[in-house]
Amino acid sequence: MSTKNSNTSQELFNLNGKPSFGQALPLAFQHVVAMIIGCVAPAIILAGVSGLSESDTVVLIQASLAMSAISTFIQLFPFIKFKSYQIGAGLPVIMGISFAYVPIMQSIAQDADVGTILGAQIVGGIVAIIVGIFIKQIRHLFPPLVTGTVVFAIGLSLYPTAVNYMAGGAGSADYGSWQNWVVAFLTLAVVTALNHFGKGILKLASILIGILVGYVVSIPFGMVNLSSVGEAKVFQLPQFMHFGIHFEISACVAIGLLFAINSVQAIGDYSATTIGAMDRVPEDRELQNGIMAYGVTNILGALLGGLPTATYSQNVGIVTTTKVINRWVLGLAAAILGVAGIVPKFSALLTTIPQCVLGGATVSVFASIAMTGMKLVASAEMDY
């Protein structure tokens, strides 16, 4: 029996192995815990800037979760093939809604609507497909100094959003109240403490735990309203073109450029995955197919109302730490996200998170984005 269990356990470290459901579930849940808040927070932030109703916010969150699941499945199990190309890297990566696009989406939303963002996302997806096809030829146009500077600037530009949320959200009646600051800094303290001193699941779930603590503390202050949860449906599929699709030149150019940069940056996540967990560098075809899938899934996501996705570095960290590269484990994580994406009550519950809690929890996320940019810049070879 022990030999059988040992053999089954070894399946976890095999890309195409078939571990038992009991072994795969906790590892899959670990991936979900590490990324789910980061996956829905951009949708919540954009909904606030765009002035979406509670029902439309739920639809946006649903689509974001569903598209994260679909994008991950396509990357894990490529099934679309055309000549020498296939859509999906076939590597153990998790896809989720990217914070990198939040500053540009906020800027667009101030003068346009969500449909304009989704239209630009379609253009960005086309750009990513082109980058994927010619990645070997154009990779030199985006050295670490360029991509790192852009990523660092994105991280810094997100801080005003976090501070506004910590204060209660711009335009709220209690903006800047002491209650908001107390809850926000308590949430930030919990996240920071667990991130620096926690181990295992406590460290991986630091943002989720911080939000749970902040959420509970905010209840006595009357910051939580659960009425939207009661009104939400139990089951609903993502709605095709719910927000419409509109094209505006400046929005398309801005998001298209960011898609090109993120396409090249994705090479870092693919490389970290294969080098750290599989003891090899990624093959050119894997990079090419992965970036092309990034473009295709974002086009599909725009049609279903989902925001731009990208590889999630925190999940890359889990894979390289545990060495669990089995695609069925990550596929199960994607399935959990997919189920969450078709349950409006779950999405409605996420909309009840007070803005001060969300602000306190995401400061560390924005800091990590800025640090990633600095690391990229530091890795560049300088000629003096």
Question: What are these model-predicted stretches?
Answer:
Residues 54-59, 189-237, 242-268, 381-384:
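Flexible hinge motifs at transmembrane-helix junctions and intramembrane kinks/re-entrant loops
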Residues 59-60, 83-99, 140-149, 202-209, ...:
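Short, non-helical or kinked segments that cap or interrupt transmembrane helices
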Residues 1-27, 226-241, 275-282, 290:
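Intrinsically disordered, low-complexity non-transmembrane regions of multi-pass membrane transporters
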Residues 21, 47-88, 257-327:
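Membrane-embedded helical hairpins/re-entrant loop segments and their flanking transmembrane helices
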Residues 29-36, 54, 146, 177-181, ...:
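Hydrophobic alpha-helical transmembrane segments of multi-pass membrane proteins
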Residues 195, 315-330, 336-341:
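Interfacial segments of multi-pass membrane proteins
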Residues 1-93, 99-108:
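N-terminal signal-anchor module of multipass membrane proteins
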Residues 108-225, 334, 338-384:
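Membrane-embedded alpha-helical modules
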